[in-house]
Amino acid sequence: AIIPGFAVSAPVERKVTREKISFLTEESAVTLDFHREQPDVPQHASYTVLRNRLDPWLMEQAEQAGAQFIPGVRVDALVREGNKVTGVQAGDDILEANVVILADGVNSMLGRSLGMVPASDPHHYAVGVKEVIGLTPEQINDRFNITGEEGAAWLFAGSPSDGLMGGGFLYTNKDSISLGLVCGLGDIAHAQKSVPQMLEDFKQHPAIRPLISGGKLLEYSAHMVPEGGLAMVPQLVNEGVMIVGDAAGFCLNLGFTVRGMDLAIASAQAAATTVIAAKERADFSASSLAQYKRELEQSCVMRDMQHFRKIPALMENPRLFSQYPRMVADIMNEMFTIDGKPNQPVRKMIMGHAKKIGLINLLKDGIKGATAL
């Protein structure tokens, strides 16, 4: 473990014991609810966190290990001697280093200035907006059917992103919930609503409104996230420099779960291991730092990025976010409607709704989904 005893000492919010996935239309929700007791081994469990609490704690751990932080300073440019990166420039100040690790987020201007990160493809990015809404621990436990320090993670497809590529999310914290949505950057230009309006409509959905009733808005934020998968991973190593985290495109949206922080941490660990080895060799050239790529290939980072490389193309299918949520809701509505008319066999009911999408489309999408996952 990078930080032994992390789950015991870190300011985590709740241990996730309930995972939900919902297909939403404007007026309905079809939900898959999975509940389990998390393992007794803390490092095998899943936790919710709030970055404004976790990040300062992480900074303290790094400082105790010998790192020095200079917060609130923007890096304006990279310092180079020939082809080698030798430091960073912040205003009039220059900080020199044997190796610079770029972790400047999904829109890595520093990586782009070196020619390592190519020009942006809008389909490789999504815009996320989030509200942190304060509730009492008792309200959270009652509304999400959890107890003690248990938590819930909930993903939504369909109406939250107005039928476009994206979806909603909800995570329970100790005394608040994190509620938001993401929408593909390439789709925003064609959207009928603005992203803030999508979030407001999401909050008013019949499945969401009771969960946040009486809550107090504590925080509002927006963030751009990578969605391109393996196809957007840039050149990771050059003379005196490496790229990690979102800047390297290390994020996986699998539909049923979203992974970003774990891949960012694992890539940073691989970079740190590489720097330590390079220092022992007194060699910070690109060929020496190429160990970083080998470390990534041996870790979960590149293995999972490679395994799920077809997911981004799957997520570009508009039927996943419009027609399929509607089809599932219509089938469930018909199954549970008693109107005095003879009931159809369920197979005929399903087939009738499936034909609206097209059996060929269903077959193609099913095969594509199976191969992607």
Q: For each of these PLM feature ranges, what is it?
A:
Residues 43, 47, 51, 85, ...:
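Alpha-helix N-cap/helix-initiation motif
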Residues 158-165, 174, 187-269, 283-294, ...:
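FAD/FMN-dependent oxidoreductases across multiple families
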Residues 7-8, 143-145, 213-215, 305-312:
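Short coil/turn segments at secondary-structure boundaries
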Residues 30-51, 182-185:
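Helix-loop-beta segment of a Rossmann-like dinucleotide-binding subdomain
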Residues 314-373:
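C-terminal auxiliary extensions adjacent to catalytic cores
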Residues 251, 270-322:
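Active-site-proximal substrate-binding core of FAD-dependent oxidoreductases
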Residues 1-28, 303:
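N-terminal FAD cofactor-binding segment of flavoenzymes
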Residues 52, 56-213, 250:
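Predominantly flavin-linked oxidoreductase catalytic cores and closely associated redox partners
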